[in-house]
Amino acid sequence: MEIVYVYVKKRSEFGKQCNFSDRQAELNIDIMPNPELAEQFVERNPVDTGIQCSISMSEHEANSERFEMETRGVNHVEGGWPKDVNPLELEQTIRFRKKVEKDENYVNAIMQLGSIMEHCIKQNNAIDIYEEYFNDEEAMEVMEEDPSAKTINVFRDPQEIKRAATHLSWHPDGNRKLAVAYSCLDFQRAPVGMSSDSYIWDLENPNKPELALKPSSPLVTLEFNPKDSHVLLGGCYNGQIACWDTRKGSLVAELSTIESSHRDPVYGTIWLQSKTGTECFSASTDGQVMWWDIRKMSEPTEVVILDITKKEQLENALGAISLEFESTLPTKFMVGTEQGIVISCNRKAKTSAEKIVCTFPGHHGPIYALQRNPFYPKNFLTVGDWTARIWSEDSRESSIMWTKYHMAYLTDAAWSPVRPTVFFTTRMDGTLDIWDFMFEQCDPTLSLKVCDEALFCLRVQDNGCLIACGSQLGTTTLLEVSPGLSTLQRNEKNVASSMFERETRREKILEARHREMRLKEKGKAEGRDEEQTDEELAVDLEALVSKAEEEFFDIIFAELKKKEADAIKLTPVPQQPSPEEDQVVEEGEEAAGEEGDEEVEEDLA
């Protein structure tokens, strides 16, 4: 509805009408310049002038359509392995195959299908579809791209008080999720009000975590169960072992008792390859390795004390800060200690002392990373102090390969799961180094500055394309490496094998040479002792007597000097004589001197 209002005013109230006409210009006033005022003029220097140098900005609005996503699942029942058979365990699969091959129905089906398949195979072999018709043409040169990496996503700690990302774990099914453990590792420096939550992130949604895990104490380690992706195992800062089931929510499903847990933070937790998928073990800086079954967390099933003296004394145990277990070697495991020593253990040994097989000393500081090569398990990688080292189980005295000393401390390392000669390291200055010792041994193939703060942990995806790095401020950066770093190269396995064997052989030769030199030095020392004659060993009595006399007189003279000094201290100080007395004393001394001179002359006569 329109509203109209009419203003009314009389014509007489408008005033007289203006009549304008053209005329010539007129000069109304003319002021002549004053020279006296010109002499008083002073230029201002400096001059304050206001300017505006801010960036001009404009506001624009855009309406973009939201990309909606939904999760769908498919349950495939036909085919595959039975539930009681773990496809990752070689022994179980071989046993199941042998059982199926003995079945009569399987044998009859193979016999019936064999004739059909034989006809198809003969057809395939009749013509070589890969035959080259133009051998004379020059092969096209393959352009090798430079190694590179790019940032895919960044997952930031949603809490206001930032914590360090201490451990990462990839989801076993498709690696579409990432579990991150957050904790403050500075002893008794945790800020007031710091949250103890850790999170599971979806790679497609970096804005909000998919699930928050709420432990009783901040988590130092966190691992997905490879058999059941809904179950996670965590090691707490107070030494407890916690277990979660994501189907039940954020709260802890199983928790070990404080009395039977570790006394220090749990720096390593690993799932074991078992039929039930419920067995695991943990390591801590209290010097203990404990085995657990998550169905009964009241006490550990087994405990090993890391006492390299093999006396099983907890006060002499070395603190464990990294843990390694290879499923192909189910009885062996390795522990990296705070003292820079790697301990190789055998779980199936009869006594606790025999469970510690050998040690590998080689670092000046704690060993923050320890991992076997996925292609050659006899060789393993360690990171401690300012270097990364590659070891062989056949050479215990020294490593076979090592990097140069960096300016910043190394914090973590991992092998590439697809290339045997590639490994990754992180540093305290926020740099990620990618090493490929098949092409270059002295320097990293690629160094990438991920962030300004220190990088604490890293984890490589199973296909080797993605790398997750956790920083001191809780920022997890997801990186994608170039195809050259995530694709197996031609003859790379043979090159890596020959390189490991050559370096191991070289270290053995050096160890043997050092052993010979030590034996020679020991023999020379023993020979010098035997060559000493009886005269050299005989006691020189005169020398001993003279030495004893000198020591005796030295003691006597020292005592006399001490007594004289004490007597001087006890003697009273005489008063100062007057000038007259001084004159009398001087005259007496002169007279005494003259008498003495006369006596001397008489004696001479």
Swiss-Prot record:
| Protein's organism | Homo sapiens (Human)
Sequence segments annotated as region (Disordered): 568-605
Report the domain of life of the source organism.
Eukaryota
Q: In which tissues is it expressed?
A: Highly expressed in trachea and testis. Expressed in respiratory ciliated cells (at protein level).
Official protein name in the record: Dynein axonemal intermediate chain 2
> What pathology is it implicated in?
Ciliary dyskinesia, primary, 9: A disorder characterized by abnormalities of motile cilia. Respiratory infections leading to chronic inflammation and bronchiectasis are recurrent, due to defects in the respiratory cilia; reduced fertility is often observed in male patients due to abnormalities of sperm tails. Half of the patients exhibit randomization of left-right body asymmetry and situs inversus, due to dysfunction of monocilia at the embryonic node. Primary ciliary dyskinesia associated with situs inversus is referred to as Kartagener syndrome.
Cited PANTHER family: DYNEIN AXONEMAL INTERMEDIATE CHAIN 2 (PTHR12442:SF7), DYNEIN INTERMEDIATE CHAIN (PTHR12442)
Subunit info here reads:
Consists of at least two heavy chains and a number of intermediate and light chains. Interacts with DNAAF2. Interacts with DNAAF6/PIH1D3. Interacts with HEATR2; probably involved in outer arm dynein assembly. Interacts with CFAP53.
UniProt GO BP: cilium assembly; cilium movement; determination of left/right symmetry; outer dynein arm assembly
Q: Where are the WD repeats?
A: 150-203, 208-246, 253-294, 301-347, 355-393, 399-437, 443-481
Instruction: State which gene encodes it.
Output: DNAI2
Please give the function described in this protein's UniProt entry: Part of the dynein complex of respiratory cilia.
UniProt KW NAD keyword: no
InterPro entries for the chain: Dynein_IC, WD40/YVTN_repeat-like_dom_sf, WD40_repeat_dom_sf, WD40_rpt
Quote the biased-composition stretches of kind Acidic residues, using this chain's numbering.
Answer: 579-605
